[in-house]
Amino acid sequence: MKPMDKFKQVRDDDVIRQVEKAKLPDFEDDYFVRRRVTFHGRVQHVGFRLELERMATRLELTGWVKNLEDGGVQAEVQGYESRIRFLLKFMRSLKRIKIETMENKPCSPKQNETEFKII
């Protein structure tokens, strides 16, 4: 295994542990929404997409996350609004990630979406 691959594996294992140990509040199901969120800052090469995907899955949210050519990350997240708010707050709380700007816009929900994926 190359040194960089080893580093990524250690980082990814840490990301998974962080998500698994995070304490989730009791959520009250509220409005079902879909949001397109664009993040800028130190959000690439830090496990951001993996962490967002794992936490979104744990929160029973659907959608996708992808890197942007300008160094940002974009996600569409669908589910109950309180869970999406928690996800965004969780991502802002991570020390190795520095979100400088976050644009959060509503978009139309998608029927039949069943998972959250990294694209």
What are these model-derived regions, one by one?
Residues 1-119:
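Intrinsically disordered, low-complexity, mixed-charge
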